[in-house]
């Protein structure tokens, strides 16, 4: 989804030979993560998707401890999850994560949970960037350039 006309977005440039969208992170469903019906509990999906975002940030050189040390935090302001097909114990899954949009002080992320080629769930997240004081702040140019390889155009989104 394109930003509204007149809405500034962070200026980004793609880094040559950098990883590109989507970021992929494998996980295995563990027995204790199941609900009473033998399916992966809905709350675990949110945790898995968060793991996917954190792994992408780490790969981009934006680990949470480093961000905190530089005075930045990512704060989730909205999550929308669609549960399509259940996962069960022992399933080997892949979390795909992409950055859909970078704005001045927020970002929009798209994610998919896959079992092979089958999409089990999707999630869209809006995360604000704040200072350690909790107030919104702008993305630094370095943060934007590190996330650029994971940024997809509206037509490219797989997550």
Question: What residue spans do the PLM features occupy?
Answer:
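N-terminal first-folded block
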Residues: 31-89, 144
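HotDog/MaoC-like acyl-thioester-processing domains
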Residues: 2-25, 58, 83-92, 99-159
